[in-house]
């Protein structure tokens, strides 16, 4: 479902006639509400049957996607704002489900097989998503060529909805070994207390502000790459898809390289390298509109974002105090980032709305031929400032004693407009000790 919905959100908003200011809302508001929903989900966990809650949310999410497809067919006057509202609900349901699904899978999949299972699942998901992404681009290009792009979008979202309904039905058939979590009083209060305690950690505070700040500055320009490609360069939908895949595929194939590099030299060095590369990405779009050049830029961005995403995820696990609640640190960092993304996207929308008038007033329009270029330049400058602020404050985490050899299992949750591939931690699992014990018994 992700490949036929999330990846086309910006393109769909442009098709519906979203203004530059509204593009900021399309990116920022769903991210903000999604994060709030994930925090709410922690509290809801003790009040509902886990399987039923997940199935109901999945079915409602499918209904939301079906509604998105209906917008393309009927095109009401306020279609863009209706789409933004549906996107908010879509992200909300995803994030309500996520913590429950993560806990459920953690109980079903044997601990010794989690790494192999989720590695295989990630490969299968990526192949399926990219295949459907290509097919979706082909459908949109074909229908757009006969002036019926609305039909292409309606088909895509209808297919995505049917896939989600099927997913909900399959989830309903699954066994849940712990259908209802025990009710614990004061869960919300305890969560807030854990957040306050985590925020007192200086290293974690600097890290969180860095990641959130970088995503904020990226969000300034993130919604407008699709606008530039589809509206200004007049890419076909298939060309648009291919340029996006160039980044996503590069991220996927370079994750292993960055993983080995960080094992050798540390996550801090990878963060420093990639945080110096990321500011240059919007600036590169100013130099040429050649399609092959843009594919090269996208591939380069995939390399940078792959290392940044992986190293920041690993760094968070490394810097948390020993025996502390990793879920609290991850939830707080995600919530902060979502809030900053909302601010950045709103700021980007305002800048884009007034960029043309500003360029004419200053006379810079002779140099910057497209108002969106001003958004790209401001995003580059602000990303650089965030990197310059964090690098002298970053520390290499000291190795802490561990009673067991542990590994943090990540899965690729999907793709987003901010950083492409989105990683999600699943669990902390014993790496080899269990296997060694079995051999000792033999």
List each model region and its residues.
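Helix-loop boundary and gating motifs at the non-cytosolic
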Residues: 1-36, 41, 61, 66-67, ...
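Helix-loop junctions at membrane interfaces in 12-TM secondary transporters
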Residues: 70-87, 284-298
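Transmembrane alpha-helix termini and helix-breaking/packing motifs in multi-pass membrane transporters
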Residues: 11-15, 42-47, 69-74, 129-151, ...
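Structural signature of the two symmetry-related core transmembrane helices
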Residues: 52-68, 161, 269-284, 380
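Juxtamembrane intracellular "pre-TM" segments in multi-pass secondary transporters
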Residues: 175-209, 397-442
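Helix-to-loop junctions at the C-terminal end of transmembrane segments
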Residues: 37-52, 140, 253-266, 352
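Intracellular juxtamembrane helix-capping segments at the cytosolic ends
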Residues: 94-109, 307-322
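Helix-loop junctions on the cytosolic side of multi-pass membrane transporters
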Residues: 153, 163-185, 263, 389-403
């Amino acid at each position: 479902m992700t490949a036929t919905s999330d990846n086309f959100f910006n393109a769909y908003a442009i098709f519906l006639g979203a203004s530059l200011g509204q593009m900021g809302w399309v990116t920022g508001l769903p991210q903000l509400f999604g994060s709030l929903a994930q925090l709410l989900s922690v509290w809801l966990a003790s009040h509902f049957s886990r399987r039923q809650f997940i199935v109901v949310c999945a079915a409602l999410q499918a209904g939301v996607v079906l509604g998105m497809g209906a917008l393309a067919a009927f095109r009401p006057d306020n279609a863009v704002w209706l789409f933004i509202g549906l996107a908010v609900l879509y992200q909300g349901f995803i994030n309500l489900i996520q913590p429950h699904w993560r806990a459920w899978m953690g109980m079903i999949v044997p601990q010794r097989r989690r790494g192999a299972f989720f590695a295989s699942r990630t490969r299968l998901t990526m192949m399926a998503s990219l295949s459907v992404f290509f097919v979706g681009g082909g459908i949109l290009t074909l229908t757009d060529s006969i002036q019926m792009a609305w039909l292409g979008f309606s088909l895509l979202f209808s297919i995505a909805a049917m896939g989600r309904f099927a997913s909900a039905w399959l989830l309903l058939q699954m066994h849940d070994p712990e259908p209802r979590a025990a009710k614990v009083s004061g869960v919300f209060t305890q969560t807030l207390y854990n957040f306050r305690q985590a925020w007192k950690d200086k290293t974690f505070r600097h890290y969180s502000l860095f990641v959130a700040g970088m995503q904020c500055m990226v969000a300034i320009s993130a919604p407008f790459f699709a606008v530039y490609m589809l509206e200004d360069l007049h890419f076909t939908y298939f060309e648009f898809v291919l340029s996006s895949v160039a980044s996503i595929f590069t991220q996927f194939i370079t994750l292993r390289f960055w993983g080995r590099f960080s094992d050798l030299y540390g996550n801090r060095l990878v963060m420093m390298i990639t945080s110096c590369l990321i500011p240059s990405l919007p600036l590169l779009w100013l130099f040429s509109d050649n399609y092959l050049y843009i594919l090269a830029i996208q591939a380069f961005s995939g390399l940078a974002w792959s290392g940044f995403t992986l190293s920041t995820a690993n760094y968070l696990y490394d810097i948390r105090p020993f025996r502390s609640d990793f879920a609290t640190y991850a939830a707080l960092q995600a919530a902060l980032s979502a809030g900053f993304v909302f601010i950045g996207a709103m700021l980007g929308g305002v800048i884009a709305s007034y960029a043309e008038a500003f360029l004419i007033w200053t006379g810079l329009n002779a140099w910057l031929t497209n108002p969106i270029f001003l958004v790209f330049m401001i995003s580059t400058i602000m990303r650089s400032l965030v990197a310059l602020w964090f690098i002298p404050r970053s520390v290499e985490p000291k190795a802490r004693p561990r009673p067991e050899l542990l590994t943090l299992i990540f899965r690729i949750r999907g793709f987003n407009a901010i950083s492409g591939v989105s990683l999600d931690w699943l669990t902390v699992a014993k790496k080899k000790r269990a296997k060694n014990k079995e051999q000792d018994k033999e």
